[in-house]
Amino acid sequence: MDKLADLNYTLSVITLMNDTLHSIIQDPGMAYFTYIASVLTVLFTLHKASIPTMKIALKTSKCSYKVIKYCIVTIINTLLRLAGYKEQVTTKDEIEQQMDRIVKEMRRQLEMIDKLTTREIEQVELLKSIHDNLITRSVDVIDMSKEFNQKNIKTLDEWESGRNPYEPSEVTASM
């Protein structure tokens, strides 16, 4: 286990792989050498990272199937990202979690729509009652005794000087 996580051991294996590749491929003009070396380096790094992680996870976890499935899905997603794909591989558990989240969000939106619909119905009923109260009813005789502007009306006899103060008078101006 110590040998798997040792940095010097990892670097020596990478150096050994590079030396082996250089000795196999003597042609300096080979165009695909860098790509082959990159892929082999990535595969080796995945191997070095996944094996100890999986061993530790299997020892500490009670459900080894889920751990192995999760590790394999993670490795496949990493390889897909390295290849340039945007898609990801998902497990059924992740799909079920996403579906539960979507269903929960749909329920929340339906409850909100129901609340809004109830409020709109209440507003329409309120507007109808306001409209019913505002409808003018025809009255034969209008009682003016309660009107604001009719309380202080004085007749011509009740005025002090006997003339209407609101009536315009003639004004002469000197020139």
From Swiss-Prot:
Ca(2+) binds at residues 120, 123. The N-glycosyl content is primarily Man(9)GlcNAc, with a small amount of Man(8)GlcNAc. It is a single-pass type III membrane protein. The chain crosses the membrane at residues 29-51. Keywords: Activation of host autophagy by virus, Calcium, Enterotoxin, Glycoprotein, Host endoplasmic reticulum, Host membrane, Host-virus interaction, Ion channel, Ion transport, Membrane, Metal-binding, Secreted, Signal-anchor, Toxin, Transmembrane, Transmembrane helix, Transport, Viral ion channel, Virulence. It is found in: Host rough endoplasmic reticulum membrane; Host membrane, Host caveola; Secreted. GO terms for biological process: monoatomic ion transmembrane transport; symbiont-mediated activation of host autophagy; viral process. Its main location: host cell. Residues 52-175 are cytoplasmic. InterPro entries: Rotavirus_NSP4 (IPR002107). Glycans are attached at residues 8, 18. Residues 1-28 are lumenal. Pfam families: Rota_NSP4. The keyword Transferase does not apply. Homotetramer. Interacts with the immature particle in the viroplasm. Interacts with host CAV1, early and late in infection. Interacts with host integrin ITGA1/ITGB1 heterodimer. Interacts with host integrin ITGA2/ITGB1 heterodimer. Interaction with microtubules blocks trafficking to the Golgi apparatus. Belongs to the rotavirus NSP4 family. Plays an essential role in the virus replication cycle by acting as a viroporin. Creates a pore in the host endoplasmic reticulum and as a consequence releases Ca(2+) in the cytoplasm of infected cell. In turn, high levels of cytoplasmic calcium trigger membrane trafficking and transport of viral ER-associated proteins to viroplasms, sites of viral genome replication and immature particle assembly. Binds 1 calcium ion per tetramer. This is Non-structural glycoprotein 4. It comes from Rotavirus A (strain RVA/Human/Japan/KU/1995/G1P1A[8]) (RV-A).
